[in-house]
Amino acid sequence: MNLRRAGLLLAFCCSPAFAAQPVTWGWVEQAKLMPENVLLMARLDTGVQTSVMDARNVVKIRKNDQRWVQYDIVVIDPATGKEQRFPFERPVERQLKVRVADGFEHRPVVSMDICMGEKLYHEQFALSDRQGDDAQVLLGRRTLEHLGAVDASKTLTTPPTCKP
């Protein structure tokens, strides 16, 4: 009986010390699109509500009487400096109305799986041509609420380790 009490006491008093500490992310991190295993740069941006993915050649199509989009994700190969294009096709979840300099723009929003650190997140991304930006992804507040705190003084703190 005493051994049992000691075990319970040990479990209650010491477990927080061994609990996983919450991750603090840098303002720029590497991320992976899964299951395609495409490595991207992501900027964690608390000023954006919906996450945004750099998408090129966006084409709206109909598939099984539903709205879909085909698009390319462009990544610069760090070894060669050449562009690599990865084709994607996803159903449109909704349209996002965004204010731009000359009015409004409607962007398709798709769901994608993104690996941050060792965890896989199923998130929504508005598709937009972000050519010329260093980060292919902006992670907005809807995604950041799942990730945790952002330290604006840090970058590249936790590489993605999810396996395809």
Predicted regions and their residues:
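Pepsin/retropepsin-fold aspartyl endopeptidases
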Residues: A19-P164
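Bacterial N-terminal signal peptides
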Residues: A6-P16
